[in-house]
Curated annotation (Swiss-Prot):
Biological function: Cell wall formation.
Disulfide topology: none
Source species: Salmonella choleraesuis (strain SC-B67)
HAMAP family with a match to the protein in the record: MurC (MF_00046)
Protein name, as recorded: UDP-N-acetylmuramate--L-alanine ligase
Amino acid sequence: MNTQQLAKLRSIVPEMRRVRHIHFVGIGGAGMGGIAEVLANEGYQISGSDLAPNPVTQQLTSLGATIFFNHRPENVRDASVVVVSSAISADNPEIVAAHEARIPVIRRAEMLAELMRFRHGIAIAGTHGKTTTTAMVSSIYAEAGLDPTFVNGGLVKAAGVHARLGHSRYLIAEADESDASFLHLQPMVAIVTNIEADHMDTYHGDFENLKQTFINFLHNLPFYGRAVMCVDDPVIRELLPRVGRQTTTYGFSEDADVRVEDYQQIGSQGHFTLLRQGMPDLHVTLNAPGRHNALNAAAAVAVATEEGIDDDAILRALESFQGTGRRFDFLGEFPLEPVNGKAGTAMLVDDYGHHPTEVDATIKAARAGWPDKKLVMLFQPHRYTRTRDLYDDFANVLTQVDALLMLDVYPAGEAPIPGADSRSLCRTIRNRGKIDPILVSDPAQVATMLAPVLTGNDLILVQGAGNVGKIARYLSEIKLKPQIQEEEQHG
């Protein structure tokens, strides 16, 4: 950003006084790195620490950030403020050193709230669909020439980044309910896609507590703000009378203010009509598969319509939508060795979904777009607590595929829980008699164990939120062909 552009931005968004150097602990996370990228482009000195390099840290380094691949007290020297992710413990040496030096230590959402404070904030919350909906809203606003700032939890593929600094007053951000930190945000517009039981440790196992927290989040809207909510979700429908703000509903339901009708999927595209009260119908071609993505698009259209964005810009953005990283991410179609003398191919798709509802939506999208293909899933459960709490739901959903390979649970720092492991889940699924899951204890053997399952007309879904995405990229690099020596580092 040049001096003239920065001066224009400062006329809209004042700088944070006395803050020059911002240090991020856990800077390699998508949410942390996105905020760091916006602040780097605003001209602040950025440093941060994490355990290993990744694409996020590489991008930040290219912007001039100083990245340490360790956690040491001296890393916070001269910092004006230290930003921490929810994954960082209070005894981290950098946090301890910051407290001793009387440097303010704040959570990621507090910094995001500061970015939003002087902007027209649009926050996207909900158990599922936040990242894709954030990208859709950002794409529509960009297509309309509104040059928004956005901060997303996943890679916005059209932009090639998780976050971007725009020169307008608009800030579009994913709002994270996993640690209730979205309560720091005070947006002008809030989308809530759905509300389900997840991250229940944060809410002390009390679903009513979770629901009330979403209401509290919506009460952060000014009285002239707007809540955009999916009326198909039974919990949202129940909570609507308690919102106390202007509300637009969307969904397939007949009473939705923005209603999805006549949905059909052809390959990776969805085709449907959006009915809007007092506005012309929109005949949408969406470059993303699945009914769940039609709902995400309806939310984005509801916000754009409220802002007065031209319908042609909305339709162009949705038809050209490039998606987000690891959300039904098509990695390629690869030729296979002939099976019974007949050559064939397998499609490879990488998807971040790790909750039963998300996995179910991905399976349905795959079935709708490619009904004749054998659906093979490589699944990695994420967290022992989630596997325990949603065990039966996982067992029900995972039996819908034609073949299942399952990796060990990605612990995300949790200790193992007896009976909430992959071996137990495989046994439960096997006992139901529909499919015979294969437990993959060694990630380095995935390609070898996958090969006999494939028929030459396959769609492989690599599913989960842990390091299974690295395996997906490795399978793409080797074109699904088992290597003589498969290195465990690719797991």
